[in-house]
Regions:
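Short coil/turn connectors between adjacent alpha-helices in alpha-solenoid helical repeat scaffolds
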Residues: 54-65, 99-114, 149-150
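Bacterial signal peptide processing site
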Residues: 19-22
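Short solvent-exposed coil/turn linkers within tandem alpha-helical repeat scaffolds
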Residues: 76-86, 124-134, 162-175, 184
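Alpha-helical linker/edge segments of TPR/alpha-solenoid repeat scaffolds
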Residues: 96-105, 143, 147-153, 180-197
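C-terminal motif of bacterial Sec signal peptides marking the signal peptidase cleavage site
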Residues: 15-17
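Structural signature of alpha-solenoid helical repeat junctions
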Residues: 43-44, 65, 85, 92, ...
């Protein structure tokens, strides 16, 4: 019985290894993108981002692929600080790090990842102060701090966003959000309102 299965197994392996050259090249490319940790090309990094982001958009979060992007985007930023795509890569690295944190069950590990995302956003705001999407760094830091239940830190980030970018749609929306959330009131004002009820 075993002797009859062995040739059949060999035949199946032979057919499965056969394929067009294009199929083999596509497989090699995908493997290279997923396994490589050396992204010298912005195109490779963009491709990796699109792969990870397309999964996020359909609700399939691949934290390993996202982490690969984060690691390579931050490394790329160190090697190519003057590349016009570098701030974009850092913004998306921060967002992915935040998404990874949100899917991390352990609170201490989740908070560590949140702080890594904040560090990426801080690095971006420091090195690229004229980046057009800079307001989103403050917004995402505020979101992170709210998720961590650090409301005073969240309020600080939101206020910085409103102060620095008051004429943007995001700045106006966050100003309204601050009013709705009650951030406009001091803790004494809130306590006074509670005691009046």
């Amino acid at each position: 019985m075993k002797l009859r299965l062995f040739p059949l197994l060999l035949l199946v392996l032979a057919f499965s290894s056969c394929g067009s050259k294009k199929e083999k090249d596509d497989t090699t490319t995908d493997t290279t993108i997923c396994e490589s940790s050396d992204y010298n090309s912005s195109k490779d990094l963009i491709d990796l981002y699109h792969q990870a982001d397309s999964l996020v958009k359909i609700g399939e979060i691949d934290t390993e692929m996202m982490q690969l992007f984060v690691d390579n985007a931050t490394a790329y930023a160190e090697i190519h600080p003057d590349d016009t795509l570098t701030p974009h890569f850092l913004l998306y690295a921060g967002i992915f790090e935040m998404d990874i944190a949100l899917s991390t069950p352990s609170e201490s590990k989740r908070n560590a990842r949140f702080f890594q995302a904040v560090d990426i956003f801080n690095d971006l705001t420091k090195k690229y102060p004229n980046y057009k999407n800079l307001p989103y760094c403050y917004y995402y830091k505020g979101q992170i701090y709210e998720n961590m239940k650090r409301t005073s830190d969240a309020e600080g980030e939101y206020r910085e966003l409103v102060h620095r970018f008051p004429d943007t749609d995001l700045g106006r929306n966050i100003a309204d959000y601050l009013k709705v959330r009650g951030f406009e009131k001091s803790s004494d004002d809130i306590m006074h309102e509670i005691s009046q009820k």
